[in-house]
Amino acid sequence: MTPAYAAAIVTWRYPPPYDCYDMTDAKPAFIASAISGFFALVDAGELIGFRSFGADGQVPGGDYDDSALDTGGGLRPDLTGKGLGRQAIATGLEFGRREFAPSAFRVTVASFNERALRVVRSLGFRDVASFLALTGGSSFEILVRPEPAARQTR
């Protein structure tokens, strides 16, 4: 993640109801730092999205343990709803598999976000829990996808 990519990501604005994904309070310097767990998704030299790995993928109120690596992400707003999400997420997960070799990936998705839920389920994620966030009271789904040892590279 470069400082320029991080600065661009925090300006992205999604239409309602997806505006809950706007990163209005995020600090570009943190997103660009090595400790943030953020990685840019770049296609032909153009920033198209990002993936995060670690605590950023968790929502306050969810029941999380260390049995899976949390991952979150976003697609540039003008690219959403065009059928690109599945490939973007799959590419990010492949990177995460190579980089971190987790036993499982875990995603937390807003319950209203049927597009994202459909995509992650098509990628092998299975529902394990639902909860209400501590802030705002929105409903979220937690889904997990085990990673077979044979597919891990570390």
Task: Label the predicted regions.
Residues 3, 11-78, 95, 99, ...:
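Acetyl-CoA-dependent GNAT
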Residues 70, 104, 115:
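Amphipathic alpha-helical recognition patches that constitute DNA-binding helices
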Residues 79, 83-91:
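Conserved acetyl-CoA pyrophosphate-binding loop and the N-cap/start of the following alpha-helix
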Residues 86, 111-129:
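Conserved active-site alpha-helix within GNAT-family acetyltransferase domains
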Residues 89, 113-115, 133-137:
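Short glycine/proline-centered loop/turn elements that form peptide/ligand docking sites
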Residues 98-108:
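Conserved GNAT acetyl-CoA-binding A-motif
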